[in-house]
Structures are given as structure tokens and as C-alpha cells.
């Protein structure tokens, strides 16, 4: 056996640091992008703010894009001709110089899951409102008002909710609540029954009297076939203090569980929320800066990047010229290295703007009906539709439409809003799920409140318009819009 040298030729895909940077910038929101730019300005002396620059860096193109003739459908237009290219192509199209250098507690182990509560119904005629400011008390009151209670049970439910603290625990005993109500006709069993119903409110685990009850309520939502659920129940019911004290040896001795079984049961318990009330907290106001503006001028829809939202940076020519004049080799390498980083950063920004503009233009062209007539005219559209039209990969479309917002005459929308699934129609066409939601909202708004429409009736009405929708689909869309069922919408 001897050592030898061999020369081989082959092809290999490589994700360069420059391409990684371009992809990362593409998926940043406008606020995150501003922070990224500020960080680049702070760390790279070759970058500077160009206060005199008016247009965003889009390779010298006019930022305003005429959507041309929207009377034709997006399908018949074929791929859109645009000088913009994908991020990877933008990075490689210009040759660049070669000098670029290149002990845990319960609080620690518990990972909060996203709040399951849906947001308020959205009014598309209003600007983007961000998160709801609803607190725990308001959230429970809202659910109480949607629950069919008798007059006595409604009063009991109100008293129970008023006794729940911000963590979600009941701070008064059943006897204290009974005494505070002062109604001789109400019995302790009635309060217990109403409490059980409230404990099924969102968030699950609410109105528990202690930690053990809180966790058992949540565990009851799991299927009985869930692995290790029986062991988890035993641990919560009988040995919660030992879990808190992390006395695993004593736990294994008392429960006769092997180490692996005990670990699995504890991991299941750690998925539960010991303070469910904190999952519903008043949300802070969220402000959205639109990335794209859509306006109608002389009967034609115009798409433009938001000039106030686009970075205005350039290379500091004074420092760049010092790369040749300096006599120190170390200084020269420092300047040349930062110069290349600055050029790549600016090029990545240009590519981001080009891609965002190109995709936004295609969305507006595809969804012209929405801009003209509203949600009911929304066409079914998936990522692949736009990807084929602009000749980019679906992953690129996904990145450029996430956390990017479009300011339109109908409100501010995330670009992802314009994508929706489809439902077949009798004439062989398709209707988007967004349009179906709009139809449901319209039907509910116009219904006789003494005889509200059931899900089955709405399905029949949509079928009369040629839209085939199952009753279960109607119920799913209705619940997503926080519209109560027909029996709870009925009024005199």
C-alpha cells in the first residue's frame, strides 16, 4: 500500500456564505431588515447611509411597476418577463474580486406552546390590527357568554370566573363561593357542576384548585392510548412533590418504575402548562410597515416598493480608495475584505428588492378580481402558481411572502394572505377557500336572526351558486372566523 496523488473532476452543490446571506435577507421582515442593516453599518466602515438616494436599490430599475393589461387572465399571460432573477442567480451574475476573506427547574423545562385561541374576526376594510388586547378575564367571559347556561348557572359561572387569578387558578373554595353568592336556592353540587364546565374552557387547565388538578385536567384531553399516560397520572396524583424535588431515586422506589419509564412519564408531564392563565395575556400593539404599495391609476393597477421602507446604503468611496493608497498590507487587506463584504451585502439587498417586486406584481396580476371586487372574487392560488409564473422555486416564493405586507385600497395584507386552497364548482371551475369564507360571512350577516342558517343550509345555498362544500367544511370555516353555531346566533 502506497500513498499517491490523484486528480478528479466532479460537480458539487455548495451553499456559499454570500448565497446564505442573500437567502437570509430575503426572509427577513422589514423591521428585522432594518436591524440587520444597522448592524452591518455598525460593523462595516465601508458601508454608509446614502441620504441623497431617493430610489431603493433595485439595480437602477424604476420602482413602480405597471401591471400592464389586467383584462387578460394570469394563466394566459404565461411567465412574466422581468429582468429580476432569483437570489442565487443574482449572486453569481457579476464576477467579484477574489479577495473576499471569509440545574433545571419546572420553569426551565416547560416549553410554552402557542396559544390555541384564535384571533378576532378580521375586517379587511381596516388596517392591520396586530394581536388582540384581550385578557384572561375577558377571554373567559367571552366563552361563558357563548355557553348555554341557565340563569342560576350563569350567575355561578360569573362568580367562579371572578375568583380565578391571572395564573388561571381558582382562589376561593366552593364553600366560599357559595357563601359569597348568598343565594339559598343554590347548592354546593351546582357550583361543582358549573366548575367542571368552566374547566373545559380555553386555555385547558383553567379554574383548577391546585397544580395537581390543573395538570390532570390537561392530561384528560389526551387520548387514553397516549404512551405513558397512566404513569403520568399516577405521578401527578400521588408524587408531584417528589417531581418538584427531583427525587428520582425515591420516585423509582415508590412507583416501581424503571428509569426509562419514569423519564418518559415525566417528559409527558413537562408538556403540560402549570400556569395556563398566562397563555392568555394582553397582546402588545404590533405595527406593520408595508413593503409594497398597490394603487389604481387611470384604470390600471400599479405596484411599487415602499420607498420609506427600502434601505438606502452605499459604499464609502473615501475609505474604498484607501485600499490602494495605504502602505500597510494589513490595512489594505482589512479595507479590501470589508469592501467585498459591503458589495455582497448591497447586492443581496438589490436581489431581495427585485424578487419582492417581481412576486408582488405577479400576485396583483393573478388576484385582480380581489382588488376590484373583494374577497368573494379571490381566486384559488398556491405557491406553485406564482413560482411557475416568475420562474422561481417554491421555497423562494415562501420566503418572500412571509412577513411581507402589501398596502392596498382594501387594507394591509400579508402576501401569504393571497394564497388559498380551492373547492370545485359545478361548472368545472374552482373557488378559493377565502371566497367561501366571504360567502359564509355574507350569509350570516344577512340571515334572519330568529331563524339563523345552519351549516347544512349554508352548504345548500352555496350549492345553489354552483359551489360544492360539505357541511363539515362550512363548520370548519365558520369556527375559524369565530362565528358561533346557529343555535347560539338565534335572537328575538
From Swiss-Prot:
It comes from the Bacteria. A motif (RPON box) lies at residues 470-478. Residues 54-92 are annotated as: Disordered. The keyword Protease does not apply. Gene3D superfamilies: Homeodomain-like, RNA polymerase sigma-54 factor, core-binding domain. Residues 382-401 bind DNA. It holds the Pfam family Sigma54_AID. The keyword Transmembrane helix does not apply. InterPro entries: RNA_pol_sigma_54, RNA_pol_sigma_54_core-bd, RNA_pol_sigma_54_DNA-bd, RpoN_core-bd_sf. One of its GO terms (molecular function) is nucleotidyltransferase activity. GO terms for cellular component: DNA-directed RNA polymerase complex. GO terms for biological process: DNA-templated transcription initiation. Keywords: DNA-binding, DNA-directed RNA polymerase, Nucleotidyltransferase, Sigma factor, Transcription, Transcription regulation, Transferase. Sigma factors are initiation factors that promote the attachment of RNA polymerase to specific initiation sites and are then released. This sigma factor recognizes a DNA element, designated as region A upstream of the pressure-regulated operon. Belongs to the sigma-54 factor family. This is RNA polymerase sigma-54 factor. It comes from Shewanella violacea (strain JCM 10179 / CIP 106290 / LMG 19151 / DSS12).
Amino acid at each position: 500500500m502506497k500513498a499517491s496523488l490523484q486528480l478528479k473532476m466532479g460537480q458539487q452543490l455548495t451553499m456559499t456564505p454570500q448565497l446564505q446571506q442573500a437567502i437570509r435577507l430575503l426572509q427577513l421582515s422589514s423591521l428585522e431588515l432594518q436591524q440587520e442593516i444597522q448592524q452591518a453599518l455598525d460593523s462595516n466602515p465601508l458601508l454608509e447611509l446614502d441620504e441623497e438616494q431617493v430610489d431603493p436599490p433595485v439595480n437602477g430599475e424604476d420602482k413602480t411597476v405597471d401591471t400592464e393589461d389586467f383584462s387578460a387572465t394570469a394563466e394566459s399571460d404565461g411567465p412574466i418577463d422581468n429582468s429580476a432573477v432569483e437570489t442565487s442567480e443574482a449572486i453569481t451574475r457579476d464576477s467579484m474580486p477574489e479577495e473576499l476573506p471569509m440545574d433545571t427547574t419546572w420553569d426551565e423545562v416547560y416549553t410554552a406552546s402557542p396559544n390555541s385561541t384564535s384571533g378576532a374576526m378580521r375586517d379587511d376594510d381596516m388596517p392591520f390590527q396586530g394581536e388582540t388586547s384581550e385578557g384572561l378575564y375577558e377571554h373567559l367571559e367571552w366563552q361563558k357568554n357563548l355557553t348555554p347556561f341557565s340563569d342560576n348557572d350563569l350567575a355561578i359561572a360569573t362568580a367562579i370566573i371572578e375568583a380565578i387569578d391571572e395564573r388561571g387558578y381558582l382562589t376561593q373554595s366552593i364553600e366560599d363561593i357559595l357563601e359569597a353568592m348568598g343565594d339559598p336556592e343554590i347548592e354546593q353540587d351546582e357550583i361543582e357542576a358549573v366548575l367542571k364546565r368552566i374547566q373545559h374552557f380555553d386555555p385547558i387547565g383553567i379554574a383548577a384548585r391546585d397544580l395537581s388538578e390543573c395538570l390532570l385536567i390537561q392530561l384528560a384531553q389526551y387520548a387514553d392510548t397516549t404512551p405513558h399516560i397512566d404513569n403520568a397520572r399516577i405521578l401527578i396524583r400521588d408524587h408531584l412533590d417528589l417531581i418538584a424535588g427531583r427525587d428520582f431515586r425515591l420516585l423509582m422506589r415508590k412507583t416501581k418504575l424503571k428509569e426509562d419509564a419514569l423519564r418518559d412519564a415525566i417528559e409527558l408531564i413537562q408538556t403540560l402548562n402549570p400556569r395556563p392563565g398566562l397563555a392568555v395575556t394582553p397582546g402588545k400593539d404590533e405595527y406593520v410597515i408595508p413593503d409594497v404599495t398597490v394603487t389604481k391609476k387611470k384604470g390600471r393597477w400599479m405596484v411599487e416598493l415602499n420607498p420609506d421602507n427600502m434601505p438606502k446604503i452605499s459604499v464609502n468611496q473615501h475609505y474604498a480608495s484607501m485600499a490602494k493608497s495605504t502602505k500597510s498590507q494589513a490595512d489594505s487587506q482589512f479595507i479590501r475584505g470589508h469592501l467585498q463584504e459591503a458589495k455582497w451585502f448591497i447586492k443581496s439587498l438589490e436581489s431581495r428588492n427585485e424578487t419582492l417586486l417581481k412576486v408582488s406584481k405577479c400576485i396583483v396580476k393573478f388576484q385582480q378580481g380581489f382588488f376590484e371586487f373583494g374577497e368573494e372574487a379571490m381566486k384559488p392560488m398556491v405557491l406553485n402558481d406564482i413560482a411557475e409564473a416568475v420562474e422561481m422555486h417554491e421555497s423562494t416564493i415562501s420566503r418572500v411572502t412571509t412577513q411581507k405586507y402589501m398596502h392596498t385600497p382594501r387594507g394591509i395584507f400579508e402576501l401569504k394572505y393571497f394564497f388559498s386552497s380551492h373547492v370545485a364548482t359545478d361548472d368545472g371551475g374552482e373557488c378559493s377557500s377565502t371566497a367561501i369564507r366571504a360567502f359564509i360571512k355574507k350569509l350570516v350577516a344577512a340571515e334572519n336572526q330568529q331563524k339563523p342558517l345552519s351549516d347544512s343550509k349554508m352548504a345548500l345555498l352555496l350549492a345553489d351558486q354552483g359551489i360544492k362544500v360539505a357541511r363539515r367544511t362550512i363548520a370548519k370555516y365558520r369556527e375559524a372566523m369565530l362565528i358561533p353555531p346557529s343555535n347560539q346566533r338565534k335572537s328575538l
